[in-house]
């Protein structure tokens, strides 16, 4: 993704050998490029997890 997705957007991010759905909770531009903080809830867990991804690894969910 060349631009930063809006906060609150539903996205898919790489996770293990596949991808998981999540929600954008913050974005920023760092010295390492554009970054996206995504909240995901993994299968079997009821606690959300946040992780940071490079913007080019994030896809808007359909």
Predicted features by range, described:
Residues 1-5, 59-62:
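Short intrinsically disordered terminal tails
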Residues 6-57:
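Basic/aromatic-rich interaction segments and small domains that mediate binding to polyanionic partners
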């Amino acid at each position: 993704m060349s631009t930063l997705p809006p906060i609150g957007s539903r996205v898919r991010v790489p996770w293990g050998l596949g991808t998981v759905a999540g929600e954008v909770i913050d974005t920023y531009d760092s010295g390492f490029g554009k970054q996206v903080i995504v909240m995901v809830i993994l299968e079997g867990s009821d606690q959300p997890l946040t992780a940071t991804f490079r913007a080019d690894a994030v896809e808007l969910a359909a």
